[in-house]
Amino acid sequence: MKQKTLFIVALVGLLLVFIAGTLFYSTQKEDQAAQMAEANRAALVRMHSPTLGRAEAPVVIVEFFDPACETCREFYPLVKQMMAANPDRIRLVLRYTPFHNGSDQVVAMLEAARKQDKFWPALEAILASQPDWVQHHTAQAPLVWKHLDGLGLNLEKMRADMTAPEIARVIAQDLDDARTLNVTKTPEFFVNGKPLPSFGYEQLSTLVEEALSSSQR
């Protein structure tokens, strides 16, 4: 009986040590990620980054995204809902991480549409039609054009603007910043400089709510 009790005590002790170690490792990873983001704050937002929302909003969500990413497509309306529920209090900043093959061409389309002040309508049309132009995890940019009809875009001008060197530089800078911040998948979110502790809508929502609460103190 005594040996059985000792065994149970030892087992419980090992379990507690494991839980404590797991929590410590998780907290340490979160702290390291937050410290990295703080040290590399300049890499989070660039002057060229597309933004939505009031410039002085107390909460800034930075999203590294790929237009060919299915999860990015799913998260976009959810982030818009957060913004609608908190008017003028949240600003969204988009950064390009075209990890899918061919996605850089779709990013170039977005930047070309931006030159005609049609970035957000083009983005929403592109995301809505994503199942049509992403095939086998590869972006088929030529299939995107038909989904841009009706937006009032000069498509011929877009085709010419897509090859502009500054667009290539924007993509290169965003990818470089993604490497600096250790962004390896999309979407990747930072809220007021803090990365998500783990990926998920609930985690993003919690971090946003915390930032909103802090801004009211």
Language-model segments: residues:
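Conserved strand-loop elements at the edges of beta-sheets that form or border functional pockets
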Residues: 54, 63, 198
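C-terminal cap of thioredoxin/glutaredoxin-like
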Residues: 1-23, 146-217
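Short secondary-structure boundary/capping elements
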Residues: 43-44, 74, 170
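Structural alpha/beta surface segment adjacent to cysteine/selenocysteine redox centers
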Residues: 57, 62-68, 73-149, 179-184, ...
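Short clusters of hydrophobic/aromatic residues that line enzyme substrate/ligand-binding pockets
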Residues: 50-52, 133, 196
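A short beta-strand-turn-helix
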Residues: 42-59, 84
